[in-house]
Each structure stands twice: as structure tokens, then as C-alpha cells.
Amino acid sequence: MSNIVKFPRASKPPAPEPVQPAAPAAAPAAPKAEGRGLVAGLVKFVWVATVLVWPVLKWVLAIITFFQFVRMLYHWNTPGVYAGWSFLAYFAALTAITYFVSIYKPKGL
């Protein structure tokens, strides 16, 4: 047996909707703060520059962070050497830049 598909019958096109008068023009937007556009443009520029060099920068930061980790392990019980804090700072920077490139996207791009 075959499956018979019934096509819809041709129907009359729907009646056009009545034309409504145009809405009044919206009030002009409030002026932007002078520094806001500058900061947004600067963040956008930094983001684009970081994204362009990210493949190389990621490797360099990862190698430096790994070196700081090994240095932290070597100087673990040495008084006066703050290698743990150095590693934490490098790791935080690597994490922050990874977030900045991967998740954050400036408005207007």
C-alpha cells in the first residue's frame, strides 16, 4: 500500500490588514557621557588586539605559568621567597585573559 498525501486546496488570500496611522516620533535619546564612548572604544581595541595575538600569547603565558608552578614547588619551604604568590598572580592573569578572549565580547562587534 502506498501513503497518499493530500495537498491543501488553493484558498483565497487573506484580506489585507487595515493601515494604522504611524506612531509619533520617539523622543531623542539622552546624550552619552563623554568618557563612556572612549572607554568602550579602548576596551574594544584591546579585545581585538588580544584576540589577534591569542594563539601565540596563550602558549607563552602557559609556559611562563608552568615555570612559575615548578619554581613554587622548588621554593616551597624557603623563607622569604614568595614563589607561591607569583604563581598565583600568573595563573590569575592567564585565567582572566582566557575569560576575556573566550567569553567576553564587546558590544558592537
Swiss-Prot record:
Query: Disordered: where is this region?
Result: 1-27
The record's subcellular location field reads: Cell membrane
**Superkingdom of the organism of origin:** Bacteria
Keyword Lipoprotein assigned to the entry: answer is: no
UniProt biased composition (Pro residues): 11-21
One Gene Ontology cellular component annotation? plasma membrane
Regions crossing the membrane: 47-67, 81-101
Alphabetized UniProt keyword annotations: Cell membrane, Membrane, Plasmid, Transmembrane, Transmembrane helix
- Listed name of the protein: Protein KleE
Organism equals: Escherichia coli
Which gene codes for it?
kleE
